[in-house]
Amino acid sequence: NRNNRDWWHFADYGCYCGYGGSGTPVDELDRC
């Protein structure tokens, strides 16, 4: 499962609902 393997790639991926996240989701993957 790619999402489980690569979750950490999104830790600093303009995260709307991730670590240090704010503002608008950058894309569908960044939505909660």
Curated annotation (Swiss-Prot):
- Which prosthetic group or cofactor does it need? Ca(2+)
* Keywords, ordered alphabetically: Calcium, Disulfide bond, Hydrolase, Lipid degradation, Lipid metabolism, Metal-binding, Secreted
Q: Which GO terms describe its biological process?
A: arachidonate secretion; lipid catabolic process; phospholipid metabolic process
List, alphabetically, the GO terms of the cellular component aspect: extracellular region
Q: Which InterPro entries match?
A: PLipase_A2, PLipase_A2_dom, PLipase_A2_dom_sf
Tissue expression, as annotated, is:
Expressed by the venom gland.
Xref: Pfam families: Phospholip_A2_1
Query: Per UniProt, where does Ca(2+) bind?
Result: Y16, G18, G20
Where does the UniProt annotation locate this protein? Answer: Secreted
Q: Where, if anywhere, are coiled coils annotated?
A: none
Q: Which domain of life is it from?
A: Eukaryota
Q: What class of enzyme is it?
A: hydrolase
Per the entry, the cofactor note is: Binds 1 Ca(2+) ion.
Recorded catalytic reaction(s): these are: a 1,2-diacyl-sn-glycero-3-phosphocholine + H2O = a 1-acyl-sn-glycero-3-phosphocholine + a fatty acid + H(+)
Indicate whether Thylakoid appears among the record's keywords. Answer: no
- Where mainly found? secreted
Q: Which family does it belong to?
A: Belongs to the phospholipase A2 family. Group I subfamily.
Q: What is this protein for, i.e. what is its function? A: PLA2 catalyzes the calcium-dependent hydrolysis of the 2-acyl groups in 3-sn-phosphoglycerides.
Report what the protein is called. Answer: Phospholipase A2
